[in-house]
Amino acid sequence: KVSYLKSFFANNLLRFIMDVFRINIKKYDLIISDFEPISAWSSKLKGKPSLQLSHQASLFSKQSPRPIEIDRLAEFFIKWYSPCDRYIGFHFKDYDKNIYGPLLRDKIVRAKPRTEDYYVVYLWNYNVDYIANILSCFKNYQFKIFDSRIENNLQIDNCEVIKTGDDSFFNAMLNCKGVICGAGFELPAEVLYLQKRLYVIPIG
């Protein structure tokens, strides 16, 4: 479960405050950020106009989907982590007048996907052995697990574990049956655009 207070204090609070006041934004007419707190808070405290472009910004609108049970602490965190004067949000649908669909990489839009007999797995916050142990129960399926922490590629039962690299991951995603990943935004948006099966694990 995500602890917002723990996440906040795990970072150096004093260093954050110093960076907010140290950053020089005097010569800029507008500060544009991507859910980045230092420039956002600096512009707010110094009276500079600011614009946020991000998926998280879409949650500023009450029209964006919410769970049935609202997490007030999460709402507070989203609102004040990276404050701004105006925003343009990106989501899976245009839920409000200043919310637009996902921004996709050119190579995703130009891609010609195929369907081969394997699934791509990208769960960076889980241990590879833990993932492989679960997926090895599905003997009739093949999985390509991507992880940046391994030194060399290896095979664990029906799971090929591959060191994460942009080209290798992109090619694997392009030609897979489906993707198993965290419930973020950018990667799921690309997977859905490529019309692949998508399985997500929410953070919570």
PLM feature segments, named:
Residues 30-38, 42, 52, 171-204:
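A donor-sugar binding/catalytic signature common to diverse glycosyltransferases
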Residues 15-25, 149-193:
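Donor nucleotide-activated moiety binding/catalytic core segment of transferases
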Residues 61-128, 145-149, 167-168:
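A nucleotide-sugar donor-handling region in carbohydrate enzymes
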Residues 29-30, 86, 118, 178:
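Structural motif
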Residues 21-75:
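Conserved nucleotide-sugar donor-interacting segment of glycosyltransferase catalytic cores
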Residues 1-14:
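Conserved nucleotide-sugar phosphate-binding/catalytic loop shared by glycosyltransferases and other
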Residues 54, 67-70, 161-164, 197-204:
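Nucleotide-sugar donor-binding patch of glycosyltransferase catalytic domains
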Residues 123, 130-163:
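Catalytic donor nucleotide-activated moiety binding site of glycosyltransferases and closely related
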